[in-house]
C-alpha cells in the first residue's frame, strides 16, 4: 500500500525540454510572439506536465466536490443551517447547483464526495466519510493527524484512479456550512497574517457578526498552535475534512502529472497546505478565478498566483474551476490548430513581441 511519503516522493518534476519545445512552437504560430499573453504561458505550463505526454491536451474533465460539516458552526460563524450541507449535496446529485450547471456547460463530470457530512448517507454521493462533521476548532483540533493522513491517501488514490480512466483535467470544489472559518484560519497560519486581514463574510454573514468570526479564528489558532511548517498539522488542527479532501486531489493529480484547476478562497487554503506538504505540487496548479472573499489576495500572493478570471464570485462548490475549463481547452486549441508563420512566408522583425 502506498504511503504518504511515497506519494510526495513520486510527484514528477515538469518536463523542461517539452516546455521549451512548446514555447518554440508557439512562437512560430501565426501571430506576433507573446501576443496571446497568458494563453501562451498556460499552454507551455501544460506541455511540461508528464501526464499530458509533452503536449497541451484535455481528455475527460472532472470536478471533485468535497462535502463536510464543521463543528465550528456552533460558534455562530455562519448564517445557513448546518443541514444545508446535506441538502445541497443531494441537489448536486440531481445536477441543479451552480457547479453542476457550469460543469455541464464545460463537458465535465461532477463527483460529489462525502468526507464528513453530519447527516445520513446520501444516495448518489461517493462515500469517503471520516466522521459526521469535524471537531470544533475553537475548542480543539478538527481531527486527528491519522484521520487527515488517511483521507489524503484515499482521495489521492481516487484521483489517480480517475486519471487511469481518462481524466486529464481536474477541478476542486467544496461544500460545507461554516467552512470559510477554518479556511481563514489556515490562510492566517500559512501566511502569518492576522485573522482580521483574512476573515470575510463567507455566505453573506452580517457585518455585525464578523468580529465574532475573527475572534473564533484567533482562538482556534491560539488553542491548537498549528505548525505552519507542517501542512498536515495545520489541516488536522484548524482545517476540516473538505479542506483535506481538496488537498488530496491536488496531491493525487500532481502524482499523475496532471493539472488541477483551483476554485476560490477555500481551495487557496488547501493549495497552501498542498504546497507546504509537497512543494512539487505547485507547477500542476492552475488558478481559475479571483475569489471575492476578503483573504483571497493574501493567499494568492503567498502562492504567487494570478487567476485567469475576475468575476466577483464567491459561491464555492468548484464553480470557478468549472468556469475556467474552457480557457484550458482554448490554450490547447491555440497550440494545435493555429497556422504557422513559416507556412505563410511571414518573417517578423526582431523585438516584435508587443505587436498587435
Swiss-Prot record:
Broad class of enzyme this protein falls into: transferase
Q: Which gene encodes it?
A: cobT
Q: What top-level branch of life does the organism fall under?
A: Bacteria
Q: What is this protein called?
A: Nicotinate-nucleotide--dimethylbenzimidazole phosphoribosyltransferase
Which chemical reaction does it catalyze? 5,6-dimethylbenzimidazole + nicotinate beta-D-ribonucleotide = alpha-ribazole 5'-phosphate + nicotinate + H(+)
Instruction: Offer one Pfam family short name for this entry.
Output: DBI_PRT
GO BP: any one term: cobalamin biosynthetic process
Q: What species is this protein from?
A: Salmonella typhi
Function noted in UniProt:
Catalyzes the synthesis of alpha-ribazole-5'-phosphate from nicotinate mononucleotide (NAMN) and 5,6-dimethylbenzimidazole (DMB).
Q: Which GO terms describe its molecular function?
A: nicotinate-nucleotide-dimethylbenzimidazole phosphoribosyltransferase activity
Subunit organization: Homodimer.
User: Which residues of this protein are catalytic?
Assistant: 317 (proton acceptor)
Q: What is its EC number?
A: 2.4.2.21
Look up the record and name the pathway of this protein. Answer: Nucleoside biosynthesis; alpha-ribazole biosynthesis; alpha-ribazole from 5,6-dimethylbenzimidazole: step 1/2
Entry's family note? Belongs to the CobT family.
Record's keyword terms, sorted: Cobalamin biosynthesis, Glycosyltransferase, Transferase
